[in-house]
Swiss-Prot record:
UniProt-listed SMART domains: Fapy_DNA_glyco, H2TH
Record field: catalytic activity: Hydrolysis of DNA containing ring-opened 7-methylguanine residues, releasing 2,6-diamino-4-hydroxy-5-(N-methyl)formamidopyrimidine; 2'-deoxyribonucleotide-(2'-deoxyribose 5'-phosphate)-2'-deoxyribonucleotide-DNA = a 3'-end 2'-deoxyribonucleotide-(2,3-dehydro-2,3-deoxyribose 5'-phosphate)-DNA + a 5'-end 5'-phospho-2'-deoxyribonucleoside-DNA + H(+)
Renumbered zinc finger spans (FPG-type): 235-269
NCBIfam families cross-referenced by the UniProt entry: fpg, PRK01103.1
Gene Ontology MF annotations: 8-oxo-7,8-dihydroguanine DNA N-glycosylase activity; class I DNA-(apurinic or apyrimidinic site) endonuclease activity; damaged DNA binding; DNA-(apurinic or apyrimidinic site) endonuclease activity; zinc ion binding
Protein name: Formamidopyrimidine-DNA glycosylase
Amino acid sequence: MPELPEVEVSRLGISPHLVGGTIQSLVLRTPKLRWPIPQELKQLEGQTILAIHRRAKYLIIETAVGSAIVHLGMSGSLRILDGDFPAAKHDHVDLVMTSGKRLRYNDPRRFGAWLWCAPDESHEVLGRLGPEPLTEAFNAEYMMDKARNKRIAVKAFIMDNAAVVGVGNIYANESLFTSRLHPLRPAHSLSLEEWQTLVANIKQVLQVAIKQGGTTLKDFTQSDGKPGYFAQELQVYGKAKQPCPHCGEPLCEQKIAQRNTFFCPQCQH
């Protein structure tokens, strides 16, 4: 599943080709992804793309008449093409520019979304979201206050979009390992110093992942079709029973909040 770094990598990859350009047409090859594709998106035709933002794992393609909100779901990807190449089986949406370039959306599992948001309105999918993890609003004091009286596992807590957005499963595992924190620790039990360490490591892990082009485990590719290379940096994710890089103890795997969790029983407390 594309997480925040993969979505940010996609934004950085497509923006130079699209922002400031004019949309010639919108090609819809399916009426429905996770939700029905709204016909209001056709209003994009003839409009100039003013900016492409990211909020959590949503991309927002902004024009004067409204915005397209794009979510990659479990297996979605965006590519920039330099012409009208034949559509493959799972190519569901094309945003065709007057320059001849086109943004193509591919999604084998169809859990992604293309939505519409009118100007000066906020779509419901963007409501009740916590701060962005790479901003100053995400800090140790905020997280300690947010975790007060929260007995859920710290891993589940940092993956809750109401607390902080975009800390997906891969990066939660890696950040907790780097911080030497056990993923099952109750969120309220972390000290301010431990929150300072964890917040700093979440920021660092996400920044490195973005720099490396994200993590390609199966479906994700960058906008130029290349894979993300952060998979080569993973220390614990997907490495159950392999030796811990710090102490050599076999790494454990356990389900926490229905997500595969990897940790060292010796190093993480």
